[in-house]
């Protein structure tokens, strides 16, 4: 009966890792395998088969010696070694860390392969895995820590150009209902059409409103950079911070002290009143959306932008109305002056015109006065004297042309109505008292 040798399977490898009682049992196992008749297989097969027990015996004896010489380290030494290795990894550069991790990982792989047949391979692999079990995880953690720790070493941006300071996209500043309602109402820059107004210096101050940001960019650090413009005649620009989670007082103060329409020289009281009204309206709308009354509004980006644009529109309309009012008042004064200086026929003053009974009414005093005037001005006749007197009177009247309160109130109301109608606003002009 032919008996074949057991195949070298994983089961056989597991059996090799089981502890052996003594060296004699190894020889017994080898002798039992050698008892197979030689005539049942060829010579080459027999030679290779006889060499198998010898290699297994030598491998098992080597493993036994390694087991006797191996000493398990106490847990505190293991933890201390692990901490020391981590410290060295953190102190090394990223390239050295990756090279060190790969070399240690390959070394651990070679060690596990060399000791695959040993009885203590499981213990050794578990000891190695406790330190280098997840090199990718350690590398990821080191990368994150190094990126955070190395960022302050980079030079922070303290000066930016106007193009770099302005936002590149605007889709998060407006609700989807506005952006998706009618594509024809969207400008080429992605903003709605109502952000473009035919008002005095609107484009300039719209750019200034876009420089109000809700958060700092990472490359700015903890401070707002300076906006650089080219040219001496360029207007002033600066970045302002207004977080989404801000109190009403912070929002009002930021709007009032902004650079919006600084050239119009609007009075502080008007800007403060306009900012308070804008924030109060936004609070009512926020409470209607959220259904709760918050001490500090946690605004969304569209709500936040809506507050800025409403305040900008209020002061822009006021600046436009005041500009139109000054022009209308100047034009009205010129018209009144022209009406008062209409050309009249060249006639002497009424006191000089002789009456019908001049011979009876003229006194000697009047005759003497007229004679003295003619004697003092022998080269000028009476008509020239009358024209000089009329010119002096007109010059005095020109300096005294003014408008009454009723006239100013009427002109102001007309300017407001024209601006509101031109912009399509349903606002009501101030009533004339």
Curated annotation (Swiss-Prot):
Biased composition (Low complexity): 48-64
One Gene Ontology term from the biological process aspect of the record: signal transduction
Stretches assigned to coiled coil: none
Residue segments, region Disordered: 1-117
Compositionally biased tracts (Polar residues): 9-47
Biased composition (Basic and acidic residues): 77-87
InterPro entries referenced in this protein's UniProt entry, alphabetically: Std1/Mth1
Domain of life: Eukaryota
Record family assignment: To yeast STD1/MSN3.
Protein's UniProt name: Protein MTH1
Native organism: Saccharomyces cerevisiae (strain ATCC 204508 / S288c)
Lineage, highest ranks first: Eukaryota, Fungi, Dikarya, Ascomycota, Saccharomycotina
This protein's encoding gene: MTH1
């Amino acid at each position: 009966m032919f008996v074949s040798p057991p195949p070298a399977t994983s089961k056989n490898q597991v059996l090799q890792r089981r502890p052996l009682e003594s060296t004699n049992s190894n020889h017994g196992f080898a002798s039992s395998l050698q008892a197979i008749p030689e005539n049942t297989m060829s010579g080459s097969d027999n030679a290779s088969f006889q060499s198998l027990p010898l290699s297994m015996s030598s491998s098992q004896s080597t493993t036994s010696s390694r087991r006797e010489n191996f000493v398990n380290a106490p847990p505190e030494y293991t933890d201390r070694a692990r901490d020391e290795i981590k410290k060295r990894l953190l102190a090394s550069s990223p390239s050295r860390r990756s090279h060190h991790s790969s070399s240690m990982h390959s070394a651990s792989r070679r060690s596990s392969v060399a000791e695959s047949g040993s009885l203590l391979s499981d213990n050794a692999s578990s000891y190695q895995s406790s330190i280098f079990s997840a090199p990718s995880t350690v590398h990821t953690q080191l990368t994150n820590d190094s990126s955070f720790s190395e960022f302050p070493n980079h030079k922070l941006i303290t000066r930016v150009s106007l193009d770099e300071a302005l936002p590149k996209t605007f889709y998060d500043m407006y609700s989807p209902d506005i952006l998706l309602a009618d594509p024809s109402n969207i400008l080429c820059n992605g903003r709605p059409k109502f952000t473009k107004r035919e008002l005095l210096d609107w484009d300039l101050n719209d750019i200034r409103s876009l420089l109000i940001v809700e958060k700092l960019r990472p490359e700015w650090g903890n401070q707002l950079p300076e906006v650089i413009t080219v040219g001496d005649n360029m207007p002033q620009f600066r970045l302002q911070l207004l977080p989404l989670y801000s109190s009403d007082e912070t929002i009002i103060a930021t709007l009032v002290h902004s650079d919006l329409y600084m050239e119009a020289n609007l009075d502080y009281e008007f800007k403060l009143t306009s900012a308070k009204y804008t924030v109060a309206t936004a609070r009512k709308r926020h409470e209607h959306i959220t259904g709760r009354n918050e001490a500090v509004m946690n605004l969304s980006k569209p709500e936040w932008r809506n507050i800025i644009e409403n305040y900008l529109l209020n002061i822009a309309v006021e600046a436009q109305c005041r500009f139109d009012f000054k022009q209308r008042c100047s034009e009205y004064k010129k018209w009144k002056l022209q009406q008062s200086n209409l050309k009249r026929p060249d006639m002497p003053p009424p006191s000089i015109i002789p009456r019908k009974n001049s011979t009876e009414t003229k006194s000697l005093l009047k005759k003497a006065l007229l004679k003295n005037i003619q004697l003092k001005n022998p080269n000028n006749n009476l008509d020239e004297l009358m024209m000089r007197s009329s010119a002096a009177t007109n010059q005095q009247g020109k300096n005294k042309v003014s408008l009454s309160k009723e006239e100013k109130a009427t002109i102001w109301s007309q300017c407001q109505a024209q601006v509101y109608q031109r912009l399509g606003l349903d606002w009501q002009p101030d009533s004339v008292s």
